Amino acid sequence: MKTTIILILLTHWVYSQNPISGNNTATLCLGHHAVANGTLVKTITDDQIEVTNATELVQSTSIGKICNNPYRVLDGRNCTLIDAMLGDPHCDAFQYEKWDLFIERSSAFSNCYPYDIPDYASLRSIVASSGTLEFTAEGFTWTGVTQNGESGSCRRGSADSFFSRLNWLTKSGDSYPTLNVTMPNNNNFDKLYIWGIHHPSTNDEQTKLYVQESGRVTVSTKRSQQTIIPNIGSRPWVRGQAGRISIYWTIVKPGDVLMINSNGNLVAPRGYFKMRTEKSSIMRSDAPIDTCVSECITPNGSIPNDKPFQNVNKVTYGKCPKYIKQNTLKLATGMRNVPEKQIRGIFGAIAGFIENGWEGMVDGWYGFRYQNSEGTGQAGDLKSTQAAIDQINGKLNRVIERTNEKFHQIEKEFSEVEGRIQDLEKYVEDTKIDLWSYNAELLVALENQHTIDLTDAEMNKLFEKTRRQLRENAEDMGGGCFKIYHKCDNACIGSIRNGTYDHYIYRDEALNNRFQIKGVELKSGYKDWILWISFAISCFLICVVLLGFIMWACQKGNIRCNICI
C-alpha cells in the first residue's frame, strides 16, 4: 500500500512540478516579418510561392496619349509622309519639317493625281529615318517639252496644280524629243531623287500628251539602272482620273551621276532630298499628342519605361521595355511569407520562424520576441534587415538594364509581291518574341529564387549568431526559440540583440539552473513507464478492495452465494 501511494505521488509530481521559475529563466524566439495576404510569385522550383512583397515587371497599359518630350513628335494630321514628301497641295505645310517621330493618322488621305509606289515601304522607311523633308531644287534642263503639267484632280487653292516636288513633262507643239539629262553629285552626302512615269488611260490620251504611241523612261547611275515602260489602259476612277502615275526613287552617292533618258511619259524630279543617317522613325497611331514627358512611345500612346517588360504593343520608339507575351511577371522584393497563426503552441505568443512569420513588425524584417520576468516584448534586428534589403534593392534596376531597348522597333511593311519575305519576317519576329518571353520568365524565376534563398539565409545567419552568443546558457527548443537558463531582463535581451551579450557573466547561474532542472526532469520514456505501472497497481488495488468487500459481506450474511452442480 505504501508503494502505491509513493508511485501515485511521484506521478503527480512529474506533471505538476514546474522546474523553471519565471524569475530565473527566459524564452527568446527569433522570427521574420509576415503579412496577412502575400503575393504569389514564380521561382525555379515552385510555380506559386507566397512572398511578403513583389513588384510588377510588365507594363500592360499606356497613358493614352503620345508625349512630345523628350522627342520631337510631328503630327501628320491629314497627310501621309509620302504625300508630304511629294508635295501634295494639302500637305504644303510640311515642307522642310523635321522630326524624331512622324505620326501618321488613319484619317490621312491623298488629294492629288492618283499614284502608286512599287516599293512604298522602303521609300517611306528611308524618308522617315532621315527625319526631315529638306529639299534642294536643281536646274534640270528639259529642252523641247512643256514643263509644269497640271491636273484638275490636284488643286492648289482654286487652280489646277500638281505635286510640288515633281515636274510633269508633256509634248511641246507636236513633238516630244528624246531627253538626255545628267546631274552629278559633287557633294559629300547621298541625294534622294523622286521621279515617275505616267500611265495614260487610253491610246488617244497617250498620243495627245506625248505624241509617241509608247514612251519610255530610263534612270541610271553607276550602280543601278531602271527602265520603265508605261502601261496604257483604263483603271478605276480616282478623283476624276482613270490614269495613274508610278513613283520611283534613286539614291545618288557622292561622286556618282544621275542620268535620265526618256522619249515620253516622264514625271521628272525638280531636285533632291538630302539623305541623313538619323534615328528618326514613323508610326501609325490615332493617339492624341500632348505636352508630357515619356521616353517610350507606342501606337497606343506613351508608356513609362520604369519596368523591364511591356505587352502594350510590339511597335515602339525610344527607350522602351522589351515586348513579351505575358500579361504579368512579378519580381519578389520581400521574403517568403508564412502568415502568423492565430493559435500557437505551448509558448503562446512566443513562437519562432520555423513555425510561422510575425505580422505587425514595423522596425525590421527580422527580429526577436521574448518572455522574461519583466513580461513580453518584441524588437527588430536592423543589421540583418539592411543586409537583405541591400541585396534586393538593385534587382529591379539590373533587370531593366538588361532588357530595355535603346532603339526603336519599326513597323514592318511589304508589298504583295514580297509576301514570302513578309511571312519569313513575321516568323522571325514571332520567334524573337517567344524567345524573349521565355527568357523573361526564366530570368524573373531565377531572381525570385535568389531573393527567397538570401532572405532565408539571413534568418538562419541571425539564428546561428544568437546561438553562438548564448552557448551553454540556453537550450535550442526547436522552432526558432531558445530557453535561457538564467535570469535575463530586458537589458540582457538587448545585449543579445546588439551582439554584446557575455555568456561568461551568466554561465554559473545558467549551469546551476540547468542541473537543478535536469536533475528532477524525467524523460518522456520514464514518464510512460510510471504511468503504466501506476495504472496497473491502481487496478490491482481496486480488485483487492472489491474482493475484500465481497468476503466481508459473505461472512456477515449480507451476501449469499449459491453454487449449483
Curated annotation (Swiss-Prot):
Lipid-binding residues (covalent, S-palmitoyl cysteine): 554, 561, 564
One Pfam family hit: Hemagglutinin
Cleaved signal peptide residues: 1-16
Cytoplasmic topology ranges: 551-565
InterPro entries found in the cross-reference section: Capsid_hemagglutn (IPR008980), Hemagglutn_HA1_a/b_dom_sf (IPR013828), Hemagglutn_influenz_A (IPR000149), Hemagglutn_influenz_A/B (IPR001364)
Gene Ontology MF annotations: host cell surface receptor binding
Cystine crosslinks: 29-481, 67-292, 79-91, 112-154, 296-320, 488-492
Membrane topology value: Single-pass type I membrane protein
Predominant location category: virion
Glycosylation (residues): 23, 37, 53, 78, 180, 300, 498
Residues annotated as transmembrane: 530-550
Keywords (A to Z) from UniProt: Clathrin- and caveolin-independent endocytosis of virus by host, Clathrin-mediated endocytosis of virus by host, Disulfide bond, Fusion of virus membrane with host endosomal membrane, Fusion of virus membrane with host membrane, Glycoprotein, Hemagglutinin, Host cell membrane, Host membrane, Host-virus interaction, Lipoprotein, Membrane, Palmitate, Signal, Transmembrane, Transmembrane helix, Viral attachment to host cell, Viral envelope protein, Viral penetration into host cytoplasm, Virion, Virus endocytosis by host, Virus entry into host cell
Superkingdom as given in the UniProt entry: Viruses
GO CC, alphabetical: host cell plasma membrane; membrane; viral envelope; virion membrane
Keyword field contains Disulfide bond: yes
Post-translational modification: Palmitoylated.
Marked site (Cleavage) residue numbers: 344-345
Family in the record: Belongs to the influenza viruses hemagglutinin family.
Note: Major glycoprotein, comprises over 80% of the envelope proteins present in virus particle.
Job description of the protein: Binds to sialic acid-containing receptors on the cell surface, bringing about the attachment of the virus particle to the cell. This attachment induces virion internalization of about two third of the virus particles through clathrin-dependent endocytosis and about one third through a clathrin- and caveolin-independent pathway. Plays a major role in the determination of host range restriction and virulence. Class I viral fusion protein. Binds to sialic acid-containing receptors on the cell surface, bringing about the attachment of the virus particle to the cell. This attachment induces virion internalization either through clathrin-dependent endocytosis or through clathrin- and caveolin-independent pathway. Plays a major role in the determination of host range restriction and virulence. Class I viral fusion protein. Responsible for penetration of the virus into the cell cytoplasm by mediating the fusion of the membrane of the endocytosed virus particle with the endosomal membrane.
Protein name per its UniProtKB record: Hemagglutinin
Lineage: Viruses, Riboviria, Orthornavirae, Negarnaviricota, Polyploviricotina
